[in-house]
Amino acid sequence: MDAQHSSNQALRTVQVAAAAIVSEGRFLAARRPLGKRFALMWEFPGGKLEPGESFEQACVREIEEELDCAIVPERVIESVEHDYDTFHLSMKLLLCTLMEGERPCLIQGEHTGLIWADAKDAMSLDWVPADREHIPAVLKELGLSAS
């Protein structure tokens, strides 16, 4: 096998901004749609950075597109590097709040469900692998334990 086809070949990196939208001691989890990778698994809403975008800008744009609401990103609470079979994910999770009067909406094709999750929900939901890695940090931010 030559180097070009080596199993150790570098994976392309995909940069993603995800939102831990918090309200009243809970955080928003979104269920992925049918027909997409990890269908019906839960995730933190967000998406890929566009050229020239910061993680904060991408987070605001993606939440507007996916949930039709406006958020205020406060800060990055965790970064995760995760290898999938066809790409390397570099994800930053931003602690966010909803702007006053805003509420997330289901938009056809984006998600099949939304839940304001507490610690019990967080541990029982079927999470996308990279997003699962963020759960302890989010619970810590909310002052909750993973028990």
State where each predicted segment sits.
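Conserved N-terminal beta-strand and adjoining loop/helix that marks the start
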Residues: 2-28, 48, 79
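A beta-strand edge to alpha-helix "cap/lid" segment located at domain peripheries
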Residues: 9, 103-105, 111, 130
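A conserved beta-turn-beta hairpin within the catalytic core of GNAT-like acetyltransferases
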Residues: 36-41
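The catalytic Nudix box helix
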Residues: 44-76, 118
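Active-site-adjacent beta-strand/loop module that shapes the phosphate/pyrophosphate-binding cleft
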Residues: 70, 80-104, 115, 119, ...
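C-terminal structural segments of small proteins and small subunits
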Residues: 119-128, 132
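Charged phosphate-binding loop/patch that engages nucleotide di/tri-phosphates or the phosphate backbone
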Residues: 130-147
